[in-house]
Design a protein with these regions (language model features):
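Short, well-formed alpha-helical segments that are part of the catalytic scaffolds
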Residues: 19, 24-39
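Active-site-adjacent helix/loop segment of glycosyltransferases
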Residues: 219, 223-293
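Conserved donor NDP-sugar-binding/catalytic core segment of glycosyltransferases
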Residues: 103-139
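Short aromatic/hydrophobic "clamp" motif used to bind/position activated sugar donors
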Residues: 95
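A short, conserved alpha-helix in the catalytic core of glycosyltransferases
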Residues: 176-179, 184-234, 362-363
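Short, flexible, basic/aromatic active-site loop/helix in glycosyltransferases
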Residues: 144-183
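Glycine-rich, basic loop-to-helix element that forms the pyrophosphate-binding segment
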Residues: 72-90, 111
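A conserved acidic beta->alpha catalytic loop
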Residues: 34, 50-59, 75
Length: 402
């Protein structure tokens, strides 16, 4: 091997992380911070594509992350085109399509890349996604939405028969939440694949409707003869998740998305029209009124930090007693769990706790009466979401920057 080839091999960029943003400035700051931590030991780049946000996203990026590539679109180009623009500018062997309302652990990309390198004929790798309460998001592994599979989705039959292989194909129930294996469809919130493969299949189809862009890309990769994988050992927080609001607009968008997918990849299906018509009828007949997300009244706050000044600032802001906790997260949460009936909000200080430990805590202590927020390192806000349905909550602070 020539010297120049050796240098190229050593210095070759392994991965480009593409983050498409639109008006989620605070989530974006948290996301980029976590990605930077996860890429510290990897030859890599971060490319943020902003779809003409009206908030302070671009100003924040230039101030906080001047070393990160920022592409400022003059219009909202949409999800497919925005990501395609980012990939076109990338130089990594792999690309990661990542939503801005996500948090990755420090070892996320090391694990994902090691897994990817272990596979032949690799397509796309997705990871395990949880929401801001630690609950599993089933859309991170799915099957090809044939007319019948789409029917089980819109009618909710997959919920009635959660263990059925026949009715559970939409969410790939052949794999457990904590089981790695092949799947057909992965979610656009987190996708890792070879850049060459992304370009080979044409990237995201810019004609796609909402809810079909990631399905289409995943299926194009399958048609190219590659295998897609769900990798459960990497857990990523996706705050907003797939909306569970099942209103008329959702039904229309889902139907349009499936129609686009079938028209592109299959012959015209009478079954599709029949199943979607029945599904729409049952949907309108049996749908329950969507419960309004009620903000929980927090009984007390627990701040995982040793910063006494921070405790005082949070107390003054919230107007409630804040308990400072500086012991191990797991032991402290176990003791808090024993006090049943209280609504306890946990605030994790990322200046002292790793993203990995925070993510582990979210997952381990889900559904135990806690809500969670994160204070990102050297940031002046606390952020989180108590439901994959809502827009999240940001609590602004005034904290002296280091």
């Amino acid at each position: 091997m020539r010297t120049d080839e050796v240098i190229h091999y050593i210095c070759a960029m392994q991965i480009s992380v593409i983050i498409l943003n639109y008006n989620v400035c605070y989530f974006l700051e948290l996301c980029v911070l976590s990605v930077q931590k996860a890429l510290e030991n990897i030859e890599s780049e971060i490319i943020v594509v902003d779809n003409n946000s009206s908030d302070d996203s671009c100003a924040m990026m230039k101030r906080r992350f001047p070393e990160v590539s920022l592409i400022e679109n003059k219009t909202n180009a949409g999800f497919p085109k925005g990501n395609n623009i980012g990939v076109a500018q990338s130089k990594g062997e792999y690309v990661c399509i990542l939503n801005p309302d996500t948090v990755v652990a420090e070892d996320t990309f090391e694990k994902i890349l090691a897994f990817a390198e272990s596979k032949t004929n690799l397509g796309i790798v997705g990871c395990k996604l949880i929401d801001g309460t630690g609950n599993f998001l089933p859309e991170c592994k799915r099957g090809v939405p044939t007319p019948f599979v789409a029917f089980t989705k819109v009618t909710g039959l997959y919920k009635v028969f959660p263990k059925s292989r026949r009715f559970g194909k939409y969410y790939a129930e052949h794999l457990e939440e904590n089981q790695t294996g092949k799947v057909d469809i992965l979610v656009g919130a987190f996708m890792v694949m070879k850049r060459d493969l992304y370009l080979e299949v044409g990237g995201f189809d810019e004609n796609c409707f909402m809810y079909s862009d990631d399905i289409d890309l995943s299926y194009m990769v399958l048609k190219a003869g590659r295998s897609n994988y769900y990798f459960h050992e990497s857990v990523v927080v996706h705050y907003k998740g797939e909306s569970t609001v099942r209103d008329g607009l959702y039904m229309k968008r889902f139907r349009d998305a499936m129609h686009f997918f079938y028209s592109k990849h299959f012959k015209k299906s009478i079954l599709f029209d029949v199943f979607m018509s029945i599904g729409a009828f049952l949907f309108s007949l049996f749908k329950k009124s969507q419960a309004v997300t009620i903000k929980r009244k927090i009984d007390r706050y627990s701040l995982f930090s040793t910063d006494k000044n921070l405790v005082l600032k949070v107390e003054n802001l919230l107007g409630k007693k804040v308990v400072m906790t500086d012991s191990t997260v797991e032991n402290s949460l176990n003791s808090l769990t024993n006090k049943a009936g209280e609504n306890i909000e946990i605030i994790f200080d990322n200046n002292q706790l790793s993203f990995k430990s925070i993510i582990n805590s979210l997952e381990r202590f889900r559904n135990k009466g806690f809500t969670f927020k994160i204070l990102p390192q050297k940031s002046d806000f606390i952020i989180g979401s108590n439901s994959s349905n809502d827009r999240g909550e940001v609590i602004a602070l005034k904290i002296d920057k280091v």
